[in-house]
Amino acid sequence: MANPIRKGADVNSPWARLEHKRADWEWRILKAYKAGNTSKQDKYARFRCAVMSPYTYGSWEYGDVYVTDIINRPGIDIVHGTPEFYDWLEDYS
């Protein structure tokens, strides 16, 4: 399957929004560099993200995050996802 979230998104309309249950961390997925099935096989697969945490003082920091660091991790929940993101996630599973 082709990568449905390969095109870059804006921080205000990301492909998905994830939050940590107990910490004040939020990840907004702006782009996936690889399709879900390819990302599953690559431990270095990355998302382009905007991240806000207690250490960013209310600002977004932009950068790459390993897929394995935020997908299917205990304590990190998907708060919102677009249909395209859920297609990517189904392909990843």
Could you describe each region identified by the protein language model?
Residues 2-18, 25-28, 38-93:
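Charged interaction scaffolds used for protein-protein
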Residues 34-35:
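Short, conserved beta-turn/loop elements at beta-strand boundaries and strand-helix junctions
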